[in-house]
Design a protein with these regions (language model features):
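Acidic, PIN/NYN-like endoribonuclease modules and their adjacent C-terminal/linker elements
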Residues: 1-12, 16-19, 23-24, 37, ...
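Short catalytic-loop micro-motif centered on adjacent basic/acidic residues
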Residues: 31-32, 56, 83
Length: 115
């Protein structure tokens, strides 16, 4: 069965206000804080996002680029990773809304996006 809407998981470095703004627009956004995963490693954060069928949003490009490459080379799937440059929360939320309104969850599988 295909999934239409992307469900987001924001790691601990991403401002929780972004999740609130996305929820106000009707999108499913979960923060590491709300999931009780603030002390989890990057590997654990991505594994959790995968277990929940969520696209990970992070500012940590260096480490998560390595992890997505590892997933690719070991043929592990993920539900997408979105790298966000540090900007005001409203601007990041707006950029995420563009993706959420134009890309399906199925299209986001194993993809990396930069905003």
């Amino acid at each position: 069965m295909s999934d239409f809407f992307i469900r987001l998981y924001l790691d601990e470095d991403v401002n929780v206000m972004i999740a609130d703004l996305l929820k106000a627009s009707g999108f499913d956004s979960l923060t590491a804080r709300d999931a009780g995963r603030l002390s989890a490693s990057d590997e654990e954060q991505l594994a959790y996002a995968v277990s929940q069928k969520r696209t990970l949003v992070t500012h940590n490009r260096t480490d998560f680029e390595e992890l997505t490459q590892l997933y690719f080379h070991t043929e592990q799937m993920h539900y997408g990773v979105i790298f966000a440059v540090r900007r005001p929360p409203q601007e990041i939320a707006q950029r995420l809304l563009v993706i959420l309104n134009q890309v399906t969850a199925d299209e986001m599988e194993n993809q990396v996006r930069y905003i």
